[in-house]
A protein has these predicted regions:
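Basic/polar N-terminal segments that are highly enriched at the extreme N-terminus
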Residues: 1-3
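Charged, low-complexity surface patches
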Residues: 5, 19, 38, 49, ...
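Acidic/histidine-rich alpha-helical segments that form the ligand environment
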Residues: 8-15, 19, 23-26, 30, ...
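C-terminal end-helix/capping segment
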Residues: 139-155
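Residue-level recognition of alpha-helical structural elements
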Residues: 5, 35-38, 82, 111-115, ...
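Conserved alpha-helical segments that form or flank metal/cofactor-binding pockets of metalloenzymes
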Residues: 30-71, 133-137
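Conserved small/polar residues in nucleotide/adenosyl-binding loops
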Residues: 156-161
Length: 161
């Protein structure tokens, strides 16, 4: 694995950890505001992002590369109403999709087919993640306060890893 690709993968590890912290911040905010179901959904997203960082690091180790965690920047803390929280989550998922696409491009430029293959799981997952958050945002916008109250309790059953 080239140094350029190792650096790009390490940047993605840091981005995944930042994403995990972002979702955790959203979770704490929603919990404090009394939306425990939504908070639980955000907790699950946080755990998923941490899992991505571990997956990338594990892949790098298998390829005899060195995973590194760089400084993880501070995430926002205040979010507004639940619709705004999920709108921000949607924009963030779109940003992550762009980062993954750029990472696939680096792997292609470096002629690393194994890494391209590894990364396609994240490309597919991002399509699903964006669609899921878009669906939530759409429902929240259409139903207004009723949907917010429904979601506040409907996601409390989620199991965390």
């Amino acid at each position: 694995m080239t140094e350029k690709l190792q650096n790009a993968l390490n940047e993605q590890i840091t981005a995944e950890l930042w994403s995990a912290n972002l979702y955790l911040s959203m979770s704490f905010y929603l919990e404090r505001e009394g939306f425990s179901g939504m908070a639980r959904w955000m907790q699950k997203q946080s755990a998923e992002e941490t899992g991505h960082a571990y997956a990338i690091a594990g892949y790098m180790i298998k390829r005899e590369a060195t995973p590194k965690v760089d400084k993880v920047d501070v995430v926002p803390q205040g979010w507004g109403n639940p619709v705004e929280v999920f709108e921000h989550a949607l924009e963030h998922e779109k940003h992550v999709s762009k980062l993954i696409d750029e990472l696939v491009q680096v792997a292609s430029e470096e002629k690393d087919n194994a890494t391209q293959d590894f990364l396609w799981q994240f490309v597919r997952e991002q399509v699903e993640d964006e669609a899921n958050v878009l669906n939530i945002v759409s429902h929240l916008r259409k139903a207004g306060d009723c949907a917010i109250l429904f979601m506040a309790v409907s996601y409390t059953h989620l199991t965390l890893p």
